[in-house]
């Protein structure tokens, strides 16, 4: 089955794909593991080691994804691991780099101000991008729901293009298929 990859992986994948313009996925080499979920010791403190026998989803997944535009994505997601986080999201471009701090739980936010690493007047500099504070009672999730409701009420366009959902899920499906095949696979997409 699908666990961390589909449950929380879709959100972190969406974040990085949005940051780079949602390019079309071409190939993927993927891996997934259920080591922690299948290990009875994981449940020992809860008194239910038998849960390991019925665990049926991944707790870790990783992939190397080739995207249109000669873009490479090194992707990792986990809900169980021997470290506090799989790490910040890092985008390395030819003109600059971007670090998006990780968060403990994906809730639509980031773990702190983002940093752009770039050259200004021949010098390497770091530019912090502050988190914009809102002065209303709505968080980012509330605002996303509101934009969807308004699109439905007013007959407007969906706030998230269907192609983005399609690409995101094609990558996740590709990770699963590549893991089963044991090698890189081509992502075949119908025209949309």
Stretches with model-predicted labels:
Residues 4, 137, 157:
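Conserved acidic
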Residues 1-72, 78-84, 163:
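Rossmann-like dinucleotide-binding domain that binds NAD(P)(H)
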Residues 18-23, 97-98, 175-178:
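Phosphate/oxyanion-binding loops and surfaces in catalytic or ligand/nucleic-acid-binding neighborhoods
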Residues 25, 86, 182-184:
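Short secondary-structure junction motifs
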Residues 12-13, 142-146, 172-173:
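A general structural signal for well-ordered alpha-helical segments in protein cores
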Residues 68, 121-123, 147-192:
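C-terminal helix-rich "cap/oligomerization" subdomain common to oxidoreductases
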Residues 7, 139-142, 166:
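Conserved phosphate-coordination/catalytic loops
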Residues 32, 51-61, 66-143, 161:
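NAD(P)-dinucleotide binding in Rossmann-like oxidoreductases
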């Amino acid at each position: 089955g699908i666990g961390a990859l589909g449950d929380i992986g879709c959100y972190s994948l969406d974040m990085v794909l949005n940051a780079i313009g949602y390019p079309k996925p071409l190939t993927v080499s993927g891996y997934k593991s259920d080591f922690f979920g299948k290990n009875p010791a994981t449940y020992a403190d809860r008194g239910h080691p038998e849960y390991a026998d019925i665990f049926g989803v991944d707790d870790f997944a990783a992939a190397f994804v080739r995207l249109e535009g000669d873009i490479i994505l090194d992707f990792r997601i986990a809900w169980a691991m021997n470290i506090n986080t799989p790490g910040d999201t890092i985008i390395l471009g030819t003109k600059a780099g971007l670090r998006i701090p990780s968060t403990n739980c994906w809730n639509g936010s980031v773990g702190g101000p983002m940093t752009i690493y770039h050259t200004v007047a021949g010098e390497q500099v770091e530019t912090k991008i502050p988190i914009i504070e809102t002065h209303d009672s709505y968080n980012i999730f509330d605002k996303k729901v509101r934009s969807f409701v308004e699109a439905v009420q007013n007959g407007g366009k969906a706030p998230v293009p269907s192609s983005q959902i399609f690409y995101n899920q094609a990558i996740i499906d590709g990770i699963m298929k590549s893991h089963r095949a044991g090698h890189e696979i081509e992502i075949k997409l119908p025209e949309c």
